[in-house]
Amino acid sequence: MECLRSLPCLLPRAMRLPRRTLCALALDLTSVARPVAACGRAANLVGRSRAAQLCGPGRLRVAGEVHRLRTSDVSQATLASVAPVFTVTKFDKQGNVTSFEKKKTELYQELGLQARDLRFQHVMSITVRNNRIIMRMEYLKAVITPECLLILDYRNLNLEQWLFRELPSQLSGEGQLVTYPLPFEFRAIEALLQYWINTLQGKLSILQPLILETLDALVDPKHSSVDRSKLHILLQNGKSLSELETDIKIFKESILEILDEEELLEELCLSKWSDPQVFEKSSAGIDHAEEMELLLENYYRLADDLSNAARELRVLIDDSQSIIFINLDSHRNVMMRLNLQLTMGTFSLSLFGLMGVAFGMNLESSLEEDHRIFWLIIGIMFMGSGLIWRRLLSFLGRQLEAPLPPMV
C-alpha cells in the first residue's frame, strides 16, 4: 500500500515528464482501454499493444515537443510584455507629422530589421539594412525609408523646435535643401546632416569667443602674475574643445567610410531599388549614386572646415601655454636673481662684520677709549662690504650674460 501511495510522486521522476503530461496520457489510455475490456482476453491484448504504442518513445517525444513549444510561447510573450516602448515621430514626403508609441519588437518586425539595429549607440554611424537607412548621431536616432522618416525617442532632447518647425518644411521641399528634385531619402539625409553640422557649428561658436577672451587675459603683458581662475576656465574650455574635435572626427570618418565604398553609396539610394521609374531615370541620365556622393562630399568639406577652425583654436591654446610658461620662468628667474643678490650682500656684510667681533672679545686695548675709532671701524665695515658686494654683482652679471651667436 505504501508503494502505491508513493507511486504518483515517483512516476514523474522516473519518466522525466511533468505530472500534467502524464495525466493527459493516462486519460488517453483509459479512453482506449474501456472498449477493450468488453471484448475478452484478445481485446485486452490488443488494448495492451495500443497502450504500449501510446506510451512509446514517439508519443512521449511529441508530448515533450508540445511542452517545449508552450514554454517558448510563454517566454516570447513575457519578452514582448517587457520590451521597451519607443516614441516614434513619423514624417512623410508632404511634411505631415504623426507621433505614436510602439514596442521595440513590433517596430523592428514592421521595418524588417533586427533587434541590434535599433540599439542606442553614442557613436555616430550610417548603416543600411533591408532597404532602410539607420542614422545614429549620439542622442538622435533616425530610420529612413523610401516613403517616410522615423525619429525615435526625441523626448528630453530639446529637439521640438527643429522637429516640428524646420524639418517638415525641409522634407516637403519648402526649405533650402539642394536635393529637393531627388527622391525622399536624399532630402532626409541632407536634413539630418545639416542639423548635425549646425549643432557642431553652434558648439564651436560658443567655445571660440570664450577661449579667445581667456587667452587675451592670460597673455596680457600688463599682468605680472597669472590668474588661476582664468587657467581653470581655460582648462574646462580645452576639454570641451577636445570633445568637439572628437565629434567632428567621428562625423568625418563615418562619411569617409561611405565615400570609399561604392556599394554603400548604391545602397543609400533606396528609391532606386524599390521604384522602377526611379531606377529607369537613374539608368538613363541622373545617376543617384553620384548625387549621393556629391551630397556626402559637401558635408565632409563642411566638417573639415570645422575641424580646421577647432585645430586653430588648439594651436592658439598651445602657443598661449608656451607664452605663459615663458612668463612664469622669467618671474622665477627674477626672484632667483634677487635671492642671490641678497645672499651675496649678507656674505659681504658678514665678512667685514668680523672686525666688530674682534672688538667684542675680552681683549685689552686702548682703542675703545677713543670714540672716533668706533665710527671709523663702522665706516670701514660698510665700505668694505659694499665694495665686495659690488664686485660679486659684476661677476654675477658677467656669468649671466647671454652668449653671442656664432659667426657665420
Curated annotation (Swiss-Prot):
Q: What's a Pfam family this protein contains?
A: MRS2-like
Q: Which residues are on the Mitochondrial intermembrane side of the membrane?
A: 360-370
Q: Where in the cell is it found?
A: Mitochondrion inner membrane
Q: List the disulfide bonds.
A: none
- Per the UniProt topology annotation, the Mitochondrial matrix ranges are 63-339, 402-408
Q: How does it sit in the membrane?
A: Multi-pass membrane protein
Q: Which UniProt keywords apply?
A: Ion transport, Magnesium, Membrane, Metal-binding, Mitochondrion, Mitochondrion inner membrane, Transit peptide, Transmembrane, Transmembrane helix, Transport
- Give the record's free-text account of how this protein's activity is regulated: May be regulated by calcium ions.
Q: Which GO terms describe its molecular function?
A: magnesium ion transmembrane transporter activity
Q: Where do transmembrane segments lie in this chain? A: 340-359, 371-401
According to the UniProt entry, where does the motif GMN motif sit in this chain? 360-362
Swiss-Prot/TrEMBL domain comment: The GMN motif acts as an ion selectivity filter.
The protein's job, in short, is:
Magnesium transporter that mediates the influx of magnesium into the mitochondrial matrix and regulates magnesium metabolism. Also permeable to calcium, sodium and potassium ions. Required for normal expression of the mitochondrial respiratory complex I subunits. May play a role in maintaining the inner mitochondrial membrane potential.
- Protein name in the entry: Magnesium transporter MRS2 homolog, mitochondrial
Species per Swiss-Prot/TrEMBL record: Macaca fascicularis (Crab-eating macaque)
